[in-house]
């Protein structure tokens, strides 16, 4: 969760936060920013130690992310070569260095499923973003003072004036600046390949999609459905 203002004390926001404790049973954290709050329940998958707990911090900026960053290890090596250091094996720890390097353009560069909130200390504002497909949920509403509140589930926002979920492939900066950084419904070109080639390419993409999801420090179990 993210609160853009300190309308609530830490004790007052706990009932909102605790409604989704089951989403992250491993650890929980509430961080006070200069103007608001960031809250995170952790389900540890990458970087299982306490060092992988969020929010992550970089020079006064903070991030909380419900997501998986695919292929993060090459990105991490590139950022290390640029002088960034990391304290955990979490894939999400690369997000603030990426934000430092690319700003809002970082979201279009990610191969990931995510719903995240960044606190930008220089602007003293929250930036919320959701992956291009909308795999990870992100809702927002307004508290009793009109401050914006972000959450993973609508029940976190009971008592707030709620808006629809943040659309897939968009980011919200501050209260009003909504930017679409990706639109998968727009087709820019069509494949001229024959049916056999198309089917082979689809098969290869499906294999690659499964393979990149197998990178985890926690034990995993495949489940088939459909």
Question: Where does each model-flagged region fall?
Answer:
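Cysteine-centered catalytic environments shared across enzyme families
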Residues: 1-226
């Amino acid at each position: 969760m993210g609160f853009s203002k300190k309308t609530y004390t830490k004790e007052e926001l706990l009932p909102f936060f605790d409604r989704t404790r089951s989403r992250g049973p491993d650890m929980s954290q509430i961080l006070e920013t200069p103007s608001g709050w960031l809250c995170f329940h952790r389900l540890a998958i990458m970087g299982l130690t306490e060092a992988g707990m969020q929010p992550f911090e970089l020079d006064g900026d903070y991030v909380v992310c419900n997501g998986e960053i695919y292929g993060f290890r090459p990105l991490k090596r590139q950022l290390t070569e640029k002088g960034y250091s990391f304290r955990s094996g979490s894939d999400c720890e690369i997000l603030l260095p990426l934000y430092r390097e690319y700003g809002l353009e970082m979201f279009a560069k990610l191969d990931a499923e995510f719903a995240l909130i960044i606190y930008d200390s220089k602007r003293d504002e929250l930036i919320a973003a959701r992956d291009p497909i909308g795999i990870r949920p992100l809702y927002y509403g307004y508290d009793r003072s009109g401050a914006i509140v972000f959450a993973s589930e609508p029940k976190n926002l009971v008592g707030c004036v709620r808006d629809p979920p943040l659309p897939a492939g968009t980011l919200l900066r501050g209260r009003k600046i909504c930017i679409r950084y990706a639109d998968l419904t727009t087709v820019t070109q069509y494949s001229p390949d024959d049916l056999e080639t198309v089917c082979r390419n689809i098969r290869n993409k499906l294999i690659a999609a499964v393979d990149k999801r197998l990178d985890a420090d926690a034990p995993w179990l495949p489940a088939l459905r459909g």
